[in-house]
Amino acid sequence: WESSDKKDKRLIFTLNNSLQAIDAVTGKSILSFGDSGYVDLRQGLDRDPSSIRRMQSMMPGIIYNDLVILGSAPGENYFSPPGHIRAYNVITGKLEWTFHTIPQPGEFGYDTWPKDAYKYAGAVNVWSEMSVDEKRGIVYLPLGSPTYDYYGADRIGANLFGNSLVALDAKTGKRIWHYQTVHHDLWDYDLASAPQLLTVKHNGKEIDAVAVATKHGFMFVFNRETGEPLFPIEEKPFPASNMPGEHAWPTQPISSLPDFTRHTVTKETLNPFFPDSIKQQWLKRLDSSKSGLYLPPSDKYETVMMPGALGGANYGNTGSNPGKGMMYVMTQEYASTYRLKKVLPPSANLSNDEVKRVKAFYTATCKTCHGANMEGGLAPSLVNAGQRIFYDEFKGIVLNGRGQMPGFVHVDEQTISALYRYLGGNPARPNFFRRMDTTSKVNGPVVASGGAKIKPDANRGAAMFDYPEGVDHPADRYTTDYGLDWMGLLSPPWSSLVAYDLNTGTIKWRKPIGEDSLYSKGDKTTGAPSGVLRKGMVVTSTGIVFATAKGGKLYAFDADNGTVLWETTLSHETNGQPIMFTKNGKQYLVVNATGTFAKDSYNHAAKPGALPRGYLVYALPDIKK
């Protein structure tokens, strides 16, 4: 951000659940911002701040005039904090407005939840990218699903503004319009990609539109000012849930625009590269499971959802040419397998010998600080700690210590696993999402010049682990893991770049992207399993789409017809969004190549002449006169 007279230039950023500001010229923290340079993002959410472990956003937010508008990544467990959208003054750090994504009494949408849900329901957050129409002063929010993702007996109703595209007055935070793309989400179908602002020719008129691509493969396009759909959307019936207390919404909105992913898994669509042993395993597995769009998860059988939690369009996966009405979507055909399991009392998952072992270990090493009933004292509460922390992190804390807690290097794996299960955890739960609830060690000129003092970490408090007293709630809780073990379950192409002409509502072209070494051995027609996760694109006004993909791939496509104009393979895996900038009239493309290649990618870092990890900058060669 910079002031209109260009004298005040600031870098606004989030760190350790805080919002801070740095002078962009000197690199010094601006200590007049917030409370001595620090805004605590755990404050102002109508929850005990000490119970909030994670609130900072995965994305930097968006600037509108003198406001920075922030989303958040509060987690996806039971009792995660709400993902309310907040705007702060970039000069003072003052909170200017809050939009309650889980409505409170008297607010629009409150009646789409149980009356007390705002006290315990969480998420409905923007963890991805917002978009702002600066001329109209409208910010567009792609909101995520409510917690818990896969079982919603404690949130019966449509659950506004979950899974909704919401248009707010960027100055005041007041709602202008909204559209909910999934009612009462039970599948983790967040809106995870940036809404694209473009102008389309529709019914003989030029209309300023906003378009959003979803994780479950649909494209929705609206009038940017009114929220009116430009293409028909039909509410269609879908199966009911067979889970106790659950009421799946009877209909879901289906866009009339062509889908960009498949929506079911069948025996005929299994990966043809599977060895026979795996193919036979899946043929048998599909006989006892169910698959289909909007099929509610169950504890009675496995549901194979396509797309799954990481399918379709995710963050960084959309771009557009606003003047031509063209939108581009990077998508991956990635299924999830779900089976709900009742959360049992900790000791119910353990044998008698394991319970004795855990109690003996706890009494000897943990009781003094964490209390006889695990409710905390000198150290935080451990009640249901296994539901709030992944096993690998838990194991690391036990072995290596944290803060004032020493490490216990003598503890064997069986005892650590039993203790974790005793605390309500499941060691098999995969950690697909990096946690952000630990204090980062900060070095460099900011600290050297007198950085803002880091406040006490939220981990010192006890996270919310049960419903508030007096609130009606289901007797049982159910959970499942993300079911992401088979990224190449379906036949290829596994990842693609899809071009939509939103003037006509058609797909203009589709090209596979990414490189796979496991199944197709580098075949360019298949793409790569999970090929666009944490990848992105840049769309130029001159008709080129630059896109990154799994396997260290960087492409330049003709934006009009999808022809590959140029491609290269980087020495390291790409991460995040590529960017472009212009200096002295020349354009430069910057790509982050700092990642490690997955097991199903070729290790280009080991090849002769490989470049070190870093940012790669490309430009067209100078034309000799």
What are these regions, as identified by a protein language model?
Residues 1-352, 417, 421-625:
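Beta-sheet-rich non-transmembrane sensory/scaffold domains
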